Amino acid sequence: MSVYLLNIALIFIWAFFLLKYKPSKNKKKAFCAIACVQWVILSGLRGMNVGADTIGYRRSFYRIGLTSWHRIFADVSDYIGGAEIKDPGYALFVKIFQVFSTNYQVYLVFIALLFMIPMAIWIYRNSSMPCLSFIIFSTLFYSFYAVTGIR
C-alpha cells in the first residue's frame, strides 16, 4: 500500500514542479510522460501476490504457452462459429506475445505499456488538469485494471 501512496506523492511533486509555475505544453507533456512511466513501473514490476487475480493469470500465461497453435486457432474458430469458449482472443494474444518472450514479468510490463501510454496521451490531449486526472485514476480506477483489462 505504501508504494501506491508514494506514487501519488510523486505525482503531486512532479505536478508542483512542472505544472504550477509557468505551465507550458512541454511541461505538461513531461508530466504526463513521468506519471505514465511511474505507472508502468508500478504495474509491470508488481509482485505475483499483488492483486486477487495475478497468480491466476500467471498460471494461465504458462498454460497457454504449453497449448499448441492448432488448439488456439481451433478455439478461436469455434468461438466465431458460436461455441462457448472462454476468452479465445486472450489466449491468441498471449500466444502471439510468447513468440517474443515467455517471461510473465515482461508480459506484465508490456500490458502496462499497452494500457498506460494511450491513457497518458489521452490525459495530455484532453485534460486541463493532468495531475487531477492521474490522481483520480490512481485512487479510483487502478484497482479495476490488471491483466483483466486486456482479457
Residue ranges and their predicted role:
Residues 1-6, 108-109, 143-151:
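Membrane-interface micro-motifs in multi-pass membrane enzymes
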Residues 13-25, 44-45, 117-127:
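Structural signal for the C-terminal ends of transmembrane alpha-helices
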Residues 29-36, 43-71:
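Extracytoplasmic loop-helix module adjacent to an early transmembrane segment
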Residues 94-97, 107-118:
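Transmembrane alpha-helices of multi-pass, membrane-embedded glycan-processing enzymes
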Residues 1-39:
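Start-transfer (signal-anchor) and selected internal transmembrane alpha helices
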Residues 26-29, 120-140:
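Transmembrane-helix signature of polytopic, membrane-embedded enzymes
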Residues 55, 59-66, 70-102:
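Short hydrophobic/aromatic helix or loop-helix immediately within or flanking a transmembrane segment
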